[in-house]
């Protein structure tokens, strides 16, 4: 359910930026979502369509880029993406892993306007 508040923030930001720049129409928004955020793109799309009604972003295409999480083995230092729902290091078999650099992203990558 947190997708509603996340999407409301996204729409508020779009409308605010559009007003600042005197944009008449937002046509496309690209959003990056890390797989560890727990944010479901389908829910964001659902709320986006509702929340943008009667705004400059109404009818805008919403595109998602999903970023796979990256983990670092605490035993050998190998950086890897999780596969088959296991967090075992594919190099040494170690099970102690830390979240590395990717997977927690949530941001607007680009906005296309008329």
Curated annotation (Swiss-Prot):
Covalent S-S links between cysteines? none
The alphabetical list of record keywords is: Metal-binding, Nickel, Zinc
Q: Tell me the Gene Ontology biological-process terms attached to this UniProt entry.
A: protein maturation; protein modification process
Residue numbers binding Zn(2+): 73, 76, 89, 92
Q: Does the keyword Zinc apply?
A: yes
Cited Pfam families: HypA
Q: Tell me which stretches of the chain form a coiled coil.
A: none
Name the residues that bind Ni(2+).
2
- What is the role of the protein in this entry? Involved in the maturation of [NiFe] hydrogenases. Required for nickel insertion into the metal center of the hydrogenase.
GO terms assigned for molecular function: nickel cation binding; zinc ion binding
Query: What is the phylogenetic placement of the source species in the record?
Result: Bacteria, Bacillati, Bacillota, Clostridia, Thermoanaerobacterales
Q: What is this protein called?
A: Hydrogenase maturation factor HypA
Per the record, the similarity remark reads:
Belongs to the HypA/HybF family.
Where exactly are the transmembrane stretches of this chain? none
